[in-house]
Amino acid sequence: MKISSRTAYITVATMGIVSLFGDVVYEGGRSLIPEYLKFLGASAILVGTVTGAGEFIGYILRLVSGSLADRTKAYWVFIFLGYGLIAVVPLLGLAPSYEIAIIFVILERVGKALRSPSRDAVISVVSKGIGSGKAFGLHELLDQIGAIGGPSLVAAMMFWSSNNYSSTFILLFIPFAALVVALLYAYKKVGRNVQPEVKEAAKGNKRLDKHFYLYNVAIGLSTVGLIPVALILYKGASIVEPSQQWLIPVLYVVVQAVDAPIALIAGLAFDRVGIKMLVLPLAASFLPMLFISYGGLTEVILACIAYGVVLGMQESIYRAAISGLAPAGARGTAYGIFNMFLGLGVIVAGPIFGLFLESQLMILPLAYVAVTQVAAIFLLLQSTKHTPDEEISL
C-alpha cells in the first residue's frame, strides 16, 4: 500500500492548520497561566508542581489513549475529543480561585493526551513518501504559527485591558470556534480518505524492541534536566514591574518564534542525519538554566531563546524518531509510551527546578543539568545501535 506524496502533504498541512488554531487558544492561555496562578496566590513550588503534574497526567493518559486508538482504530474519535477539551482554556477566565484554575489546567492536558497519539500516528503513517522529519517539521511549523499568534493575542489583550486576566481568557473563545470549523473541514477533506490506509497500516507488526525503550528512557532523563518554560516565565514575572506583566506573554512568543523555524530545519536535517541528530537538543538543554542562573531580564530572554531551540527540535525530531523505532501497527501505543517517559521527566523537573529557583543555589542546578544530559546522551547513543528488523512499509 502506498500513500502518495500529494496526500501526505495535504494531510500534514490540514492537520497543521487545525493545530494552528488549537495553539492560538491553549498556547495563548498557557503563556499567561504561570503568572495567573501567581496572581491567584500560588507559590513557585506549586506552579512548578502543577505544571509537572498536569503534564504527567496528560502523558500517562497518552499511553492509554494511544493503546486504545491502536486497538479500536478510532484515531479520529480521539482527535475530536482531544481538541474539544481545549474549551476549558477560555473558561479559566471564570475561575474564582487557583484551585479551580488548576483543575482547568489539568483538563486541558487531558485533552492533549487524547488527541496527540492519534494525530501523530496518522502523520507518521502518511509521512513515508516525504520523510518523517519533514512531515513533523512542517506540522510543527504550522503549529507554531498559532503558538506565536496565541501569546501575541494574549499580550495585546492584557495590555489593552490593563492586565485583566478574566477578559483575556474569555477572548480565546473566538479562536476556539475557528478551531472547531477547521477540525470539521480537516476530517471532511482528508480524514475519510486516509482513515482506511491508517487502519490497514496499523494491522502489521506490533512489537517494540529494547532500542525503542532505551530511546524513551534517554528522552525522559533529558527532560528531567530541562527547566520547564513555566518557571522561566515565573522568573521573568518576578523581575519585571507589576505594570509590565504583559511582557511575560511576549517572552513566551519569543520561545515559539524560535521554535517554529528550528522545527522545520531540524526535521529536514533529521531525514539526512538520523537519530544521532538528537544529541544536539540534549546538549543544548543545559543553556536555559545557565542563562536564568545569572542576571536579569536580558538573561531570561536568552533562556527563552535557548528553550525555543530545544523545543523546536523536541517537537519535530523527537517525534519523527519514533517512526524508525516503532512499526506502524504500534504507532499509537509507541507515541503513548514516548509521551509517558516525557511526562515522567516533566513531573520530576517541575518541583526540582521550583526548589532551585526559591533556594537560589545556582551552582547545584547547573551541575544537576550537566549530569542528567550527559547520561541522556549516553543512552541515546546506545539506542542508535539498531538495525530495524523490517523496513516499515506503508
Q: What does each model-identified segment do?
A:
Residues 77-91, 173, 276-291:
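Structural signature of the two symmetry-related core transmembrane helices
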Residues 104-145:
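Cytoplasmic helix-loop-helix junction between adjacent transmembrane helices
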Residues 61-73, 158, 262-274, 357:
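Helix-to-loop junctions at the C-terminal end of transmembrane segments
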Residues 274-318:
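C-terminal transmembrane helical hairpin of 12-TM major facilitator-type secondary transporters
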Residues 167-184, 364-382:
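Symmetry-related core transmembrane helices of the 12-TM Major Facilitator Superfamily/SLC fold
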Residues 35, 39, 149-167, 348-364:
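Transmembrane alpha-helix termini and helix-breaking/packing motifs in multi-pass membrane transporters
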Residues 2-55, 213-241, 245-251:
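Helix-loop boundary and gating motifs at the non-cytosolic
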Residues 9, 92-105, 293-303:
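Helix-loop junctions at membrane interfaces in 12-TM secondary transporters
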